[in-house]
Amino acid sequence: FQLPPCQLINQTVSVEKEGCASCHPVETTICSGHCITKDPVIKIPFSKVYQHVCTYRDFYYKTFELPDCPPGVDPTVTYPVALSCHCGRCAMDTSDCTFESLQPDFCMNDIPFYY
């Protein structure tokens, strides 16, 4: 079994904005795949060990206008489009570095709220 290497893939992601009724799927490119990591057997206190993740090398932001926002709510949202990927430290400002992240097509608007 061979894991796919860190590479660009096409992905449908959901974009949404607080105040707008629903989320909308958009096509983009993201970074996905396996990076070789090492975990030292002997742990040295206070030493920094970084796990490499598949993350953006180059990207730009694309703008999408949500069609169902009420008056007074700015309907524009931006989302990243990956141009190239590499294995490196996780950049918290551009990547989801959590252990179990939400799926790219997850929508907060789909969660029922109970009052």
UniProtKB/Swiss-Prot annotation:
Q: What is this protein called?
A: Gonadotropin subunit beta-2
- Give the disulfide map: 6-54, 20-69, 23-107, 31-85, 35-87, 90-97
Q: Which family does it belong to?
A: Belongs to the glycoprotein hormones subunit beta family.
Return the InterPro entries for the record.
Answer: Cystine-knot_cytokine, Glyco_hormone_CN, Gonadotropin_bsu, Gonadotropin_bsu_CS
Which one GO biological process term can you cite for this protein? G protein-coupled receptor signaling pathway
Report the subcellular localization: Secreted
Establish whether keyword Secreted is in the entry: yes
Q: What does the entry list under GO cellular component?
A: cytoplasm; extracellular space
The answer to whether the entry has keyword Glycoprotein is yes
PROSITE patterns to which the protein is assigned, alphabetical:
GLYCO_HORMONE_BETA_1 (PS00261), GLYCO_HORMONE_BETA_2 (PS00689)
Quaternary data: Heterodimer of an alpha and a beta chain.
| Domain of life per record | Eukaryota
Annotated coiled-coil segments of the chain: none
Sorted UniProt keywords: Disulfide bond, Glycoprotein, Hormone, Secreted
**GO terms assigned for molecular function:** hormone activity
Task of the protein: Involved in gametogenesis and steroidogenesis.
Organism for this UniProt entry: Thunnus obesus
Stored Pfam families: Cys_knot
Which residues get glycosylated? 10
